[in-house]
Amino acid sequence: MEMWQKVLLSIVGGLFTILLVVWIAFQVSPRPGAFLINRLFAGKAEITEPTKFQAAQQQVVVTKDLAYPSTHQENQFDLYLPKAKAPVLLWIHGGGYVGGDKAGMVEFATRTAADAHVAVVAMNYQLAPDSQYPNQLQQVDELVHYLQRHATDFPQLDLTKIFIGGDSAGAQIALQYATVQTNPDYAKTLNLTPRITKELQGTLSYCGPVDLQQVAHEQSQDRFLKFFVKTVAWSLLGTKDWQHSAQLQQASVAQHVTASFPPTFITDAQNFSFQSQGEALVQKLTALQVPVTSLFFQEALNHEYQFDYALPEAQTCYQQTIAFLKEYQ
């Protein structure tokens, strides 16, 4: 055999070995895939409407990286305060449970604090797969408990009026926490005690997977979407057989809401998002006679469209969000 043939075989063999090791790594653990997805959500948040953002900055005091006691990591929150005491909007960021950060909420939180006169609490939580379900829910509870116990340290927070919302994965976490507050039997299954049954004024879901059980039955032909769903679910629930996990059904908000659920704002998009899940929750809440404001579009908008304020649809969403918060304060 010629020398060049031996070299070529060595290179091919080496590449095959590397590919085999990578393939095995993706089969035995969600971590490689979770790392790649996490990178998709990394990077500095882009300000999409600078003029209005800068105007809002003049009306809002921002304090970043405050800590709340937690048994988990990433236990920090940012506080966006208008000039006077205000109701609270607790916001939970998205990122597929494996990525994202509260820093990405800066434009939304600043403008919302100014325009709706609410104090926005933007929280972080430890990401999957390092922290698995329902730890993220527990961290929301830890933050709420901390704010209640230290109310005198935050005199500008009107903790008698609390909204809770989120985007993407954060919306599921937020609305599940609201379900805990309004369904005592459900709260017991999660070993949580309702803390804000009277204080909870409303919930907001931006492109949230609020009926998670649907993903177990979807037959998407999109390879990336299949990879994304499999990786996220495996990372969050801790099992490769996540489709048959009892926790998947438990985390499906639409299956556990009751007539005691608070007024809710729901929006979603068609592309790479969870519009059918949002529609399922709208249908359920409407049947329960819970006030619900929904915003869906025929246009092919992308997941998390609502934060791109250059889009007219995002501006409509923002205007309706402010109106919702003002109505139910």
Give the residues covered by each predicted segment:
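Alpha/beta-hydrolase superfamily serine-hydrolase fold, recognizing
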Residues: 2-329
